[in-house]
Amino acid sequence: MAFITLRRAFCHKSILWIPGAVVALKIHPASHAPKAVTDRLSVCFCSLQPELFRVRFHHAYCKNFHSEKGNDFHPVGEPWSSQAQEWNQPGQSLQNEDEEMLFRRLSYFTSFEEVLSFISALDTLPVPLAMAALLRICEIGRRDGEQRLPEGVLENRAFQALCLRCERDPSHLTNAGLVTALQSLLTLLPADPQSSLMLSLVAECQRRLQRGNLEVHHLCVLGESLAMLQGASCETLKLVVRQLQSKSVETFAPEEITSVYRILQVCPEEVDKHQMFLNTLNNFSISVVPYLSPKSISHVLTALVALDQTHALPLLIKLGKYVVRYIPRFTNEELRKVLEAFVYFGHSDRFFTEALEQHVSALCFSLDPAVASSVMGYCSRKRILSKPIFDVVSEIVVCQWDRLSPSQIAELIEPFGKLNYVPPNAPALFRKVENVLCARLHHFPPKMLLRLLHSCALIERHPVNFMSKLFSPFFLQRLQGKESYLDRLSLAQLTQLFLTSVLECPFYKGPKLLPKYQVKSFLTPCCSLETPLDLHLYKSVVIGLIDLLGSRLYFASKVLTPYYYTIDVEVKLDEDGFVLPCTVDEDIHKRVALCIDGPQRFCLDSKHLLGKEATKQRHLRLLGYQVVQLPYHELELLTSRLELVDYLQRKLFSQSSAVHW
């Protein structure tokens, strides 16, 4: 809702329409005006004689007029051809034209020069016409993809005269023209909140706001402009929010719902004050979701994150349903915001994953690296092992590594280790990663480098050539930075890499990690390299073991080994295969480590262990433990205590006929 397009047409009436991000002045024959437009009659705009030049608003319900990305500046099928020459023929007098013809002529111009030449030729310049010309210039800049107007336009004397004329007396503008002008100028003019033009427009908006003359649509446009111009500290913005809260949410159009969320998003620290209004808004928005564009859905999800609306589950589910449909239509930035919101709210479903797989596979090498990083981050956080996505990403790293920044390389590679997936092109992938690290090692921040190499080790791609650098005092000092100590997660990753070098890389002869940098346990509350025990499954297994072994004395729980790992349940055996009491420390021939693996130790909805759990079990075997895995998907099939005991007996003792109890 940022720009005004003066549309070409031949008729008696004028309609100001708002397709998503563009306010467009479009002229239709009165007999053919769409009913959805005529039903939403609204405010006069920018007329020297308001009775001659009226405008109307319509909302985004009318899909025929909907401009999803806000860049449809002309009717479909009408080319952008300059019409300036026909207005410069001899015998025509600009001064004698009526007001409607002036606005109509302005709608034909397609360049800055045409608009400025037209304005320069006028003897008098009414405020409404000056504002329409100014907005036409802004719209041309937006159409041409300008981030701001060119310096040549800003320094043009006719343009400066336009700004001065609009600044002097904005009271002649209608509410729609005023708020739209403010929003439009913020987009392409230098963002100086103290400029006299901005101050004049804001002051006029404040006067009308205090009189209570602004409708919901005007409040939304004004609120977004004030948020952009002055931020959350703006008292006028708070007044806008209060007036919006006094309105009936049920009368809000879809684009107005989106605007309200964006306005509230600017003030997350005041969310408690607005929570009742937000609850009403969240509940009503469920019915509006089908009418939202992909851009609006992305905006709403972003606002829900900023406002921490984790309890708005029905709205999130409805938004998620439509996100699945719109994935190919999202821009890269919008899709990133959607993924961030889904991670924040913990939302995932197989339909979204399938749609994401299709989208990534279809784009393949044209997939934007930033989007690829966001997709992999989403899969990693949600523990979603999507082989189609991971395979495409591995090919992107191999073939387009020179397009990737160090942070993107790390973000794309780390999920492979976390989710314990080795792609089909693993030799080429990790050879490329090694080459990149050799060439650009100093471009990787210390913690990022450590995370990257640690994730490689989780899938047995051991960074032997870099271990000496990781364990060197110089790197450890860089890793610590200005802090007084190294964070525990970094120490745990270093310790596990050191243990890996000892157990899996006996040929490594470089520096060792000093004991003062080694953690005592990988299982810690905030930064664990092990997944905590599932207590429900643990209690079931304990009951079964007591029935099987005859006493709680014959097994120990949550045993911390000298090698930093914590074993869920440990059973000790002597040389003859007899089960020993857990308190005995002599004559132990074998230790059995029972891994009670709950759902959190696997990738989502699969039987595929996470990288850290697979590494733990691999290391325990190398340390001499007999590892017995008790996965949740097997335990949940047991329907009786007798079945549980029989299951544990088979798991514990089928591997050795010499075991007794």
UniProtKB/Swiss-Prot annotation:
<dbReference type="Pfam" id="PF08373">
    <property type="entry name" value="RAP"/>
</dbReference>
<dbReference type="GO" id="GO:0044528">
    <property type="term" value="P:regulation of mitochondrial mRNA stability"/>
</dbReference>
<dbReference type="GO" id="GO:0005654">
    <property type="term" value="C:nucleoplasm"/>
</dbReference>
<dbReference type="InterPro" id="IPR050870">
    <property type="entry name" value="FAST_kinase"/>
</dbReference>
<feature type="domain" description="RAP">
    <location>
        <begin position="592"/>
        <end position="650"/>
    </location>
</feature>
<comment type="similarity">
    <text>Belongs to the FAST kinase family.</text>
</comment>
<dbReference type="InterPro" id="IPR010622">
    <property type="entry name" value="FAST_Leu-rich"/>
</dbReference>
<dbReference type="GO" id="GO:0033617">
    <property type="term" value="P:mitochondrial cytochrome c oxidase assembly"/>
</dbReference>
<comment type="function">
    <text>Required for normal mitochondrial respiration. Increases steady-state levels and half-lives of a subset of mature mitochondrial mRNAs MT-ND2, MT-ND3, MT-CYTB, MT-CO2, and MT-ATP8/6. Promotes MT-CO1 mRNA translation and increases mitochondrial complex IV assembly and activity.</text>
</comment>
<dbReference type="InterPro" id="IPR013584">
    <property type="entry name" value="RAP"/>
</dbReference>
<dbReference type="Pfam" id="PF06743">
    <property type="entry name" value="FAST_1"/>
</dbReference>
<dbReference type="Pfam" id="PF08368">
    <property type="entry name" value="FAST_2"/>
</dbReference>
<dbReference type="GO" id="GO:0005739">
    <property type="term" value="C:mitochondrion"/>
</dbReference>
<keyword id="KW-0496">Mitochondrion</keyword>
<dbReference type="InterPro" id="IPR013579">
    <property type="entry name" value="FAST_2"/>
</dbReference>
<keyword id="KW-0809">Transit peptide</keyword>
<protein>
    <recommendedName>
        <fullName>FAST kinase domain-containing protein 3, mitochondrial</fullName>
    </recommendedName>
</protein>
<dbReference type="GO" id="GO:0070131">
    <property type="term" value="P:positive regulation of mitochondrial translation"/>
</dbReference>
